[in-house]
Design a protein with these regions (language model features):
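Short beta-strand elements in bilobed, periplasmic/extracellular small-molecule ligand-binding domains
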Residues: 99-110, 194, 213-234
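Flexible loop/hinge segments that line or gate small-molecule binding clefts
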Residues: 135-179, 199, 259, 285-297
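Flexible loop/turn connectors
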Residues: 242-346
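An alpha-beta-alpha
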Residues: 180-223, 327-342
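Amphipathic helical "hinge" segments at domain boundaries
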Residues: 10, 44-48, 57-124, 128-132, ...
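Short, solvent-exposed amphipathic alpha-helices that sit
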Residues: 87-101, 176-179, 183, 203-222, ...
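N-terminal helix-turn-helix DNA-binding module of bacterial transcription factors
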Residues: 1-73
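Hydrophobic alpha-helical segments within soluble ligand-binding/sensing domains
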Residues: 169-194, 234-242, 261, 302-321
């Protein structure tokens, strides 16, 4: 027996389709339609309610996973942290193009870096019968994955757990940020400010922060940290950042997330006469606007498209029981130095 997390009552060890129908307040036929991906005559409210009940009771892995293991749908479930940013767009493009070449289609979900949303995406996609998953995981994803017990191939990208035995592909974030920070030190910047989203949600963010701080500690340089999130406006960022810009000390601003770079630029363009000699600016990813503005902005460019292709390749190889590809890939970023960090010290 176990306690139903929805009602607090007791249920049998084996959750049945009748239990799901009762908890969701729908018929067994409606549950069956949901499990088979037939949503055309189903309201969004009903769909969401069933998704929630199935996720909370772990119904899928305990009852239908085994039956789905024996048929192939040529569907791949892709879970992205934030599908709106340019990095994610290129990742998805890489996954899609490689998958289509191999006869697969993808279903994409955005988790918003929430473990609960990751669970919902995974269980919902599993109910549709996907052959495997490609996931940008939060730091606690692997624990959840083991708990729900879905026996499907999975490939991590961008933020793999370093002790995971699963497939993964990532970029060399630590080394890239360390090298870029070292370049800033060599340019003559003496103080540093890092603007970052919560670094403890994604392994990638932690690697970038470690690369930044390790380099500065080694060079005995001072630095400050500004935390921001999706709700941070340019005005809010200005209030935090400007106090660090009033010193005569050459200061470099490192923006760790591509979706924060435009906000940092809006703040710093009011000081563009001081860029790059007094103020430096560096960010992440190959954003088109960064080379069009004056001064142009130095960026660390990730091979996002190639990372998406690699993730699809190693997953499909696993699905099809092939061993042609190395199961773990580390791709290299490059530093695209532009005017925002080229100090004229001569």
């Amino acid at each position: 027996m176990f306690i139903n997390r929805l009602t607090g009552g007791f249920m049998s060890d084996k959750v049945t389709i009748n239990d799901i129908a009762k908890l969701a307040g729908v018929s067994k036929t409606t549950v069956s339609f949901y499990l088979n991906g037939k949503f055309d005559k189903m309201s969004e409210e009903t769909k969401n309610r069933l998704e929630d009940v199935i996720a909370r009771t772990n119904y899928y892995p305990n009852t239908i996973a085994r039956s789905l293991n024996y048929k192939q749908t040529h569907l791949i479930g892709v879970v992205i942290g934030d599908i709106t940013n340019s990095f994610a767009n290129q990742i998805v493009k890489g996954i899609d193009e490689y998958s289509r070449q191999k006869g697969y289609q993808m279903i994409v979900g955005s988790s918003g870096y929430s473990l609960d949303n990751e669970r919902r995406c995974i269980t919902g996609m599993a109910a549709m019968g996907v052959d495997g998953f490609i996931v940008q995981p939060t730091v606690h994803f692997e624990t959840m994955w083991k708990e729900i017990g879905i026996h499907k191939p999975i490939a991590y990208f961008d933020s793999p757990n370093p002790v995971s035995n699963e497939l993964w592909v990532k970029t060399n974030n630590y080394e890239a940020v360390y090298d870029a920070t070292e370049q800033l030190v060599q340019e003559g910047y003496e103080h540093f400010v890092i603007i970052t989203a919560d670094p403890y949600i994604l392994e990638t963010r932690m690697e970038r922060n470690r690369g930044f701080t390790d380099c500065l500690d080694r060079n005995k340089k001072s630095y400050d940290v500004i935390l921001a999130d999706e709700k941070t406006t340019a005005a809010m960022l200005e209030e935090k950042l400007v106090p660090y810009l009033k010193s005569d000390t050459p200061t470099a601003v490192f923006v760790c997330n591509n979706w924060l770079l435009d906000k940092a630029y809006l703040v710093l363009r009011n000081y563009k006469d001081l860029i790059p000699n007094k103020i430096g600016l560096i960010g992440f990813d190959s954003l088109e606007w960064t080379e069009l503005v004056t001064p142009s902005i130095t960026t660390i460019v990730q091979p996002a498209y190639e990372e998406g292709q690699a993730a699809a390749r190693i997953l499909i190889d696993r699905i099809e029981n092939q061993n042609q590809e190395v199961p773990n890939w580390i791709l290299h970023c490059r530093i695209n130095q532009r005017d925002s960090t080229k100090r004229n010290t001569k």
